[in-house]
């Protein structure tokens, strides 16, 4: 599992927006980039200072750059394309989960980059012992 900050170097303009207190970066064609920042319990959504609206071409270029990062790091088990469907792409790049959406899935090209905010172990959840037993015995099924 990747640790916080453990990812291949992203394009400089993206790395600069992913400051230490940023958990999520939202990019959308025709809009100013926004971040979700702060600690759990005190999170705010704000525009990125000094940034202009991103164009569709810039968004396409960034998506291509992100896909190239995966192709350029075949030795990393934490860099892969998880979902690739018409209008939707989900990438794991180190500790970052990245979603790319575009028409017809969304009304405009969007990229969301999410960092992990907490890493909890199973024991930190208030779960019934039967459920913990089922999970640890490798039973199959859906966990909701």
Mark where each language-model region is.
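P-loop NTP-binding catalytic core
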Residues: 49, 54, 68, 72-141
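N-terminal anchoring/assembly modules that precede and organize ATP-driven motor systems
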Residues: 1-82
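Hydrophobic anchor at the beta1->P-loop junction of P-loop NTPases
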Residues: 144
């Amino acid at each position: 599992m990747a640790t916080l900050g453990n990812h291949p170097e992203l394009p400089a303009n993206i790395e600069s927006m992913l400051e230490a207190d940023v958990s999520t970066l939202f990019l959308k064609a025709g809009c100013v980039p926004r971040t979700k920042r702060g600690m759990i319990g005190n999170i705010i959504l704000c525009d990125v200072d000094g940034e202009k609206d991103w164009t569709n071409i810039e968004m396409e270029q960034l998506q291509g750059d992100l896909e190239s990062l995966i192709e350029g790091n075949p030795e990393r088990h934490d860099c892969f394309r998880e979902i690739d469907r018409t209008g939707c792409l989900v990438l794991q790049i180190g500790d970052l989960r990245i979603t790319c959406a575009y028409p017809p899935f969304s009304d405009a090209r969007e990229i969301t980059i999410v960092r992990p905010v907490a890493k909890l172990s199973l024991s930190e959840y208030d779960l019934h012992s039967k459920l913990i037993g089922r999970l640890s015995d490798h039973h199959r099924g859906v966990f909701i």
